[in-house]
């Protein structure tokens, strides 16, 4: 996951230089992800800090949040794979890179191994490999 903003928003408001500065920026979020109006960042020595944010836009889908960020309306957090191209093109700029966002864990729920069909095992194996490769690619 990565905290990003568009160059247009940063030209208008400047770059946040500390986690506390994030409250000065409008924030776009996927509904329910930052329900407490706070985001977690990793500070030095892997210490988690909770930082308040000013949520101005919420959507049930990340694509709407991405569009809002690209339009320069807010800063926000997205999964790295969904905005990798925009970051490479310079349409989104990572913020506070020395305070990374903790990753989400990914889980596959399935019946006990003895009850899992061959097709489900193959699908789970392919999905695991695909996601591992996708999520390990560098974000910026």
Named regions from a protein language model:
Residues 29, 50-61, 99:
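Short beta-strand-to-loop elements that line the ligand-binding cleft
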Residues 26-47:
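Secondary-structure junction motif
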Residues 4-30:
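Flexible hinge/capping segments at coil-to-helix
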């Amino acid at each position: 996951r990565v905290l990003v903003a568009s160059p247009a928003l940063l030209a208008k408001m400047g770059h946040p230089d500390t986690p506390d500065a994030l409250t000065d920026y409008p924030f776009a979020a996927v509904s329910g992800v930052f329900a407490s109006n706070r985001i977690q960042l990793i500070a030095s020595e892997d210490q988690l800090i909770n930082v308040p944010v000013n949520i101005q836009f919420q959507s049930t889908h990340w694509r709407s949040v991405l569009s809002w960020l690209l339009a320069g309306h807010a800063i926000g957090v997205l999964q790295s794979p969904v905005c990798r191209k925009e970051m490479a093109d310079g349409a989104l700029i990572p913020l506070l890179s020395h305070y990374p966002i903790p990753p989400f864990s990914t889980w596959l729920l399935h019946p006990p191994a003895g009850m899992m069909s061959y097709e489900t095992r193959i699908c789970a194996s392919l999905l695991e490999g695909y996601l591992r490769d996708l999520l390990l690619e560098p974000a910026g």
